[in-house]
Amino acid sequence: MANQKKLQVTLRRSVHGRLQKHRQCVRGLGLRRMHQTVLVDDTPENRGMIRKVSYMLEVQEA
């Protein structure tokens, strides 16, 4: 699986005051702080979490 596609995900908006499930999705993607960027595998599970909190994220293909 070394050739699996990756997504570069950056947290652009704060999780304060958001729904608990949305905060859990952000945490599940490995994001802790604003403006932090992580690389995640392009899987249906990660795509679902990204879609749920897309208003807080910036996503690019890596």
Curated annotation (Swiss-Prot):
It comes from the Bacteria. GO terms for biological process: translation. CDD domains: Ribosomal_L30. InterPro entries: Ribo_uL30_ferredoxin-like_sf, Ribosomal_uL30_bac-type, Ribosomal_uL30_ferredoxin-like. Keywords: Ribonucleoprotein, Ribosomal protein. It holds the Pfam family Ribosomal_L30. SUPFAM superfamilies: Ribosomal protein L30p/L7e (SSF55129). The keyword Zinc-finger does not apply. GO terms for cellular component: cytosolic large ribosomal subunit. GO terms for molecular function: structural constituent of ribosome. Part of the 50S ribosomal subunit. NCBIfam families: rpmD_bact (TIGR01308). Belongs to the universal ribosomal protein uL30 family. This is Large ribosomal subunit protein uL30. It comes from Halorhodospira halophila (strain DSM 244 / SL1).
